[in-house]
Amino acid sequence: MSHANTPRDWVLRAPQHGAVERIEAYFAGHGYDPHRHDTYAIGQTLAGVQSFRYRRSQRHSLPGGCLVLHPDELHDGEAGSQEGFRYRMLYVEPALIQQALGGRPLPFVRGGLSDDPRLIAASRALLQAMDTPLEPL
């Protein structure tokens, strides 16, 4: 695992497992500029408030919920409170999700935030131990 060596902000990367990447990060203020991913970004805010622009609206992720950012959707990120924010994120190729769904259509989470208990439990299991290799989906 690598850990960014900065005074306050850091990013921890879990060992790569095929088409899945996992990170845990902390940002005290500005997190990242607007960008896109080719993958689904599925995660959870662990502490603080994670604020981000997504689909032309300002969003705020709190501990206990689930973030699902769809491929090729522009988003940014910053702390929504003075304490900063810590989160874990899983980046998954769309084909892998479709395979896990048995070919059913890919899911869509409007607005990027979900309080669905099934999704929260599933993402928590995948994000739990950053130093543990993932099991196949």
Features from the language model and the residues they span:
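Amphipathic alpha-helical segments enriched in hydrophobic/aromatic residues interleaved with Lys/Arg
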Residues: G103-L137
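N-terminal regulatory/effector-sensing and dimerization cores
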Residues: P7-F108
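C-terminal regulatory/effector modules of DNA-binding transcriptional regulators
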Residues: M1-S2, H35
